[in-house]
């Protein structure tokens, strides 16, 4: 039997809700000192995470988030059918080295800072299609490894313009499944469930590559805002919704500069999301006291805010339906140095509150 789940031009509406079984967030001290510090599972004081290199540190923090998400659901690595993970480093090395010991079938992803949306989208399709009982989605970033990869060595001490964002040192991981998570207890289970309330993924809108010709690697918000606009507008059109049909629309890391551009672009399309919009990069830091300029960025920005703040907020009845839109600037060292622009992409995930029947 052919199940048609496409919705509009580029979205999918799942016939069966995809349950977020558990989630975990791991960050460093700077993120722990920010406004959301109390929401994260683990705050590590050592930016090296007990390793000798920045890259190994990022691998370690992603592994910690993945293992914690698995542990919260009372599972083992052998219970997970697939792992979708990615990061900002070349050949997704933080993910491949970080998760190698887990021995879980692995798909390495690259969507820049949109990777958490990419992993949740692919994981949800696999769950709804019956290709796994439990699927792990994870992403990470590290301030120092990203600076080393894309910008300047830390010892160089370059000046950062106000449009620049601060790469989050953090990771987020989620376990997806086709059944409601078990009730949490005080001993072994800390699942994403509050009595009968769970969080489910009900739909996705896959991002398109949008290139407005920006070439400023220190203004990622401007590169990503057109992609966020395109995806949000298509999501609203495909699902026949208004911005007010979402309690909140969370973008990944547009920052203050990108948010302004996003509002202007969506206004041109006839949408005003200003009353429901929040940006993970603007939430995770206090720009005034932490000197983060336009806000936070990185794969770990949207992922850690989702796992630490947004998903728990859904089961605590803070929001009934949200749109999670992590945003990515597809910055390549090679193409950038050859003079090419930096295209953007954004993937949207619809996450809703779900009430489990009393007998379950």
Task: State each model region's role.
Residues 20, 54-114, 245-260:
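Conserved beta-ketoacyl condensing-enzyme motif
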Residues 21, 85-86, 135-141, 322-327:
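Short beta-strand segments
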Residues 31-33, 94-96, 146-151, 214, ...:
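Short acidic, glycine/serine/threonine-rich loops at helix termini
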Residues 58-74, 122, 223-238, 305-310:
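Short, well-ordered amphipathic alpha-helical segments that serve as non-catalytic structural scaffolds
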Residues 96-99, 254-269, 334-342:
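Short glycine/threonine-rich loop-to-helix capping motif typified by GTGT followed
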Residues 110-137, 176, 297-318:
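Active-site-proximal alpha-helical scaffold in enzymes
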Residues 227, 233-265:
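Long, repeat-rich segments with strong aromatic
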